[in-house]
């Protein structure tokens, strides 16, 4: 069974995540280790992120697995090898969750990204990056966005 390109099969992704986590050998060091990785494992991380962004019945389970296990971050070397360093991706998950909440509220208020950008003194590109979880926002930025969206910023 291949990876579901449309991220429709979230139970399959949960199963694959558990299988990967159970077989991973974590070396307790602060360094990355150069290893050869099956490209399907690399692709799984990409589609897992898409499945989480899509939501659904298993989105919370997928996020929990990612955050508790410290899924590997990967970068491809020129020679086709991956450097794998383990770290906790909670910040990545939080950025995506916050971004989705911003986007949902903006759409609920019928604001365009350009209008929200003008209200917050940011660029539309920055708003887009925030909504897609590709920008680590400062508290000041989040405060301005929350104010523009008529929300209260809660840092709990």
Predicted regions located by residue number:
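Intrinsic-disorder/low-complexity detector
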Residues: 1-92
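Residues within alpha-helical segments
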Residues: 16, 20, 86, 106-107, ...
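Short basic helix-loop element that most often maps to the first helix and adjoining turn
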Residues: 100-116, 144
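DNA major-groove recognition helix of helix-turn-helix/homeodomain DNA-binding modules
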Residues: 138-155
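Short alpha-helical DNA-recognition segment
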Residues: 110-128
């Amino acid at each position: 069974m291949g990876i579901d390109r449309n991220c429709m099969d979230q139970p399959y992704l949960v199963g694959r995540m558990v299988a990967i986590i159970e077989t991973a050998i974590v070396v307790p060091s602060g360094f990355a280790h150069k290893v050869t990785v099956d490209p399907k494992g690399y692709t799984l991380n990409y589609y897992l992120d898409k499945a989480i962004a899509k939501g659904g019945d298993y989105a919370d389970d997928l996020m929990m697995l990612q955050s508790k296990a410290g899924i590997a971050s990967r970068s491809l070397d020129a020679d086709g090898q991956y450097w794998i360093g383990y770290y906790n991706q909670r910040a990545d998950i939080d950025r995506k969750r916050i971004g989705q909440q911003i986007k949902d509220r903006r759409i609920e208020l019928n604001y365009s990204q350009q209008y929200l950008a003008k209200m917050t003194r940011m660029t539309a590109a920055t708003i887009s990056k925030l909504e897609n979880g590709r920008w680590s926002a400062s508290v000041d930025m989040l405060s301005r966005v929350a104010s523009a969206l008529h929300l209260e910023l809660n840092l709990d």
